[in-house]
Each structure stands twice: as structure tokens, then as C-alpha cells.
Amino acid sequence: MHDLLTPAFRTLSARLGQDPLRVQGPGGNTSIKSNDVMWIKASGTELANAESDPIFVAVDRNAAKAEAEGAGDGSCKATVLDPVNSLRPSIETTFHAALDWPVVAHTHSIATSVHASSPEGRPIAQEKLAGLPAIFVPYA
């Protein structure tokens, strides 16, 4: 199960987390999945430390998707595959579980936050990401 946490995935996660223009606070989230197992950055950990610290927690992806549909309490604690692991899954676990891409890198960049909260955000994103598989989620 740990074989998903490759050095390349950890390096990607750490590099994103170490760039202050791409991250705010603990740095967003990365996840990697195969079949029903998904590893995601744990709540309260820092993405920048992905290469040196145990910041990822394995969850049952189907159980996380069920939480999005109202099963469970929404914390995704019940989806954790290792009952001894004290790490809590990210609050955005259900979002990552719903996406079919094997790797999801989700950051909180300053520029993206500015554009997403701007009335021009959607058209700018559509122009910049034309032809790419991207989802625009308006800033809440």
C-alpha cells in the first residue's frame, strides 16, 4: 500500500509546498490513488515536509466518496485504512476522492485566489487553460 508514495510524488508535493506563491498556510493538498486506496495529505501537516515527515494518510476511496453523499460525519475519519494512524484526512478528502485522475495537486496560490474571487476569474481561467482538463471552482 505504501508503494504509491513514490519519491517522485513526495518530491512534487514538497516542491509545491515550498513555493510561497503557490501555497498559503499548510500548502494545499496532494493525493495519489490506485483502485480503492487513496493517500492524501493529512490535516494540520505541511505539504513542504512531504519528503521528510509522515504527512500522508491512506483512506478507502469508496468510503470517502460515500461521505460526500452523506454517509458518515463528513470528517472522513472512518475512511482511514490504518486504525493505528493518528493522522486525520484533509477536509478536502471527498473532493480528491471524487476526481478520477490518479494524482491530484491542489494548492492555494495567491494569484489563483485573486483571479477566482474576481468577476474576470472564469474567463481568464478558460483562456489560460484552454484544451486542458481543468475544473473551475469559484472562490467561496
For each feature predicted by the language model, list its residue ranges:
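Glycine-rich flexible loops
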Residues: 1-140
